[in-house]
UniProtKB/Swiss-Prot annotation:
<dbReference type="InterPro" id="IPR001841">
    <property type="entry name" value="Znf_RING"/>
</dbReference>
<dbReference type="InterPro" id="IPR013083">
    <property type="entry name" value="Znf_RING/FYVE/PHD"/>
</dbReference>
<keyword id="KW-0862">Zinc</keyword>
<dbReference type="Pfam" id="PF13445">
    <property type="entry name" value="zf-RING_UBOX"/>
</dbReference>
<feature type="zinc finger region" description="RING-type 1">
    <location>
        <begin position="129"/>
        <end position="169"/>
    </location>
</feature>
<comment type="function">
    <text>E3 ubiquitin-protein ligase. May participate in CpG methylation-dependent transcriptional regulation.</text>
</comment>
<keyword id="KW-0156">Chromatin regulator</keyword>
<dbReference type="InterPro" id="IPR019786">
    <property type="entry name" value="Zinc_finger_PHD-type_CS"/>
</dbReference>
<dbReference type="InterPro" id="IPR011011">
    <property type="entry name" value="Znf_FYVE_PHD"/>
</dbReference>
<dbReference type="InterPro" id="IPR036987">
    <property type="entry name" value="SRA-YDG_sf"/>
</dbReference>
<dbReference type="InterPro" id="IPR003105">
    <property type="entry name" value="SRA_YDG"/>
</dbReference>
<comment type="pathway">
    <text>Protein modification; protein ubiquitination.</text>
</comment>
<dbReference type="GO" id="GO:0042393">
    <property type="term" value="F:histone binding"/>
</dbReference>
<keyword id="KW-0808">Transferase</keyword>
<dbReference type="InterPro" id="IPR001965">
    <property type="entry name" value="Znf_PHD"/>
</dbReference>
<feature type="coiled-coil region">
    <location>
        <begin position="566"/>
        <end position="602"/>
    </location>
</feature>
<keyword id="KW-0238">DNA-binding</keyword>
Amino acid sequence: MAIQTQLPCDGDGVCMRCQVTPPSEETLTCGTCVTPWHVSCLLPESLASSTGDWECPDCSGVVVPSAAPGTGISGPESSGSVLVAAIRAIQADVTLTEAEKAKKRQRLMSGGGDDGVDDEEKKKLEIFCSICIQLPERPVTTPCGHNFCLKCFEKWAVGQGKLTCMICRSKIPRHVAKNPRINLALVSAIRLANVTKCSGEATAAKVHHIIRNQDRPDKAFTTERAVKTGKANAASGKFFVTIPRDHFGPIPAANDVTRNQGVLVGESWEDRQECRQWGVHFPHVAGIAGQAAVGAQSVALSGGYDDDEDHGEWFLYTGSGGRDLSGNKRVNKIQSSDQAFKNMNEALRLSCKMGYPVRVVRSWKEKRSAYAPAEGVRYDGVYRIEKCWSNVGVQGLHKMCRYLFVRCDNEPAPWTSDEHGDRPRPLPDVPELENATDLFVRKESPSWGFDEAEGRWKWMKSPPVSRMALDTEERKKNKRAKKGNNAMKARLLKEFSCQICRKVLSLPVTTPCAHNFCKACLEAKFAGITQLRDRSNGVRKLRAKKNIMTCPCCTTDLSEFLQNPQVNREMMEIIENFKKSEEEAEVAESSNISEEEEEESEPPTKKIKMDNNSVGDTSLSA
């Protein structure tokens, strides 16, 4: 018996068996793979369908004897049945859109799949040549918005003389086919993908010596690599609490895994290194711990500024910055510029605005205060910032950021004999407010307040959610990865900029001269200009003249292209993905503590220029 092969219609609607273009009423569309078939070329056995939607011979899984070779495998054991089952599973997935279902069906029909494609390959598949289905080499973008390799495009348009896009069948202008232009924005995207992969492999091969928290000693330690004696180059000891670095308020017993009592008011430590091991104040040099976009979690009173006034239950605190720390200086008592509400100062102002509790530690270095401990560092409870302002400091030259802290803790202060904690108290009079500028007073209800019914301080609003990973090694790994990729992503977004508005492309269109513009910007550039200009003057009628619409970047005429400019969808998806990753990176970056953390794996061996956020410490041992 002769084998009768059944074939569907191609992309142009031509039957692949009889080479005739049938009318729509003489075609059947498969309900599974959405492929048109010529009814006259189908065998009668294939036209019978037991379900409501007709299925083509390829999807039905039923092999017609007259249409199959004698050695074929039929029935549900055939590979076609597996393919049909996979397609039906895609169709039944309610979480997918119609476009996503179509992509998955096409990938299955072409012999590909998701399981064998890793994340890097998936990223590359966002940009591919529509002919060779590979990363385009010297990419060319047609006016219809599809991308090709330069060689593939020349072979298609010049070698074979086909002036229609193989994807959408749109007409390709002759001047584009004759002189295609390389899309430099796509070149940058492909280069970034390749460089990112290479840098990722190189980073993975690098060995990092990491000491996990459970393997650390109980106290700060040094190694033979330490340049200075004492604790100047010491690494941190073991952390005894499980709070993240952006934790607000007291440290509860649930986070004290060793004692199950939390950190109590009045606890003291030998130095700032031990203090940070209990999570009360993490920076071992800087006086403010916080993030400008999140708030300040803790401050240290250690005599860094002569402007500070300590009255126990309330104190006036001075912000950071305004001092020259160049030349590897750690401390400079001379104020050389004005302080501004940014970085750590902005973090304190945000805590004032939101009414967050701020942990306060006092150091023995504060010699002018009657409430400072005689030795070491002591935790004195949580305070709330009620006001902040700017005023000229005691040196009389530059403005300082000033803050009014008022105690609001459920435990009594270490210098009192009370058995209960604080109660709401009136704000003290501050004489320097008469000459203050940039005064800010919180008007809305604070997040940390006093509950009259329960008689204690508590969170009146939900506390801020932590944005930082608890695991130190995981945090450092993410930091290294973001540091390597942020510069490349910023460069890529710069490459994907509109040549008119100079912003990141929105609905990008690629002109025949390979320049990229926002669709709205390009249309607005030529708004009100018609394709033809009427030259009749009332006396005699002349032929209409074509208006030349010159590209904003070159002398190419875009009049034909502007009749129906098509958005480059692949480029738009790439831009959206990178913008999303940039936003995630910015959110993660804003949650990082701005003070530089010491290298917890090994002590540093080179000099480090301290940031102006360092306040008042003359040694690491507080």
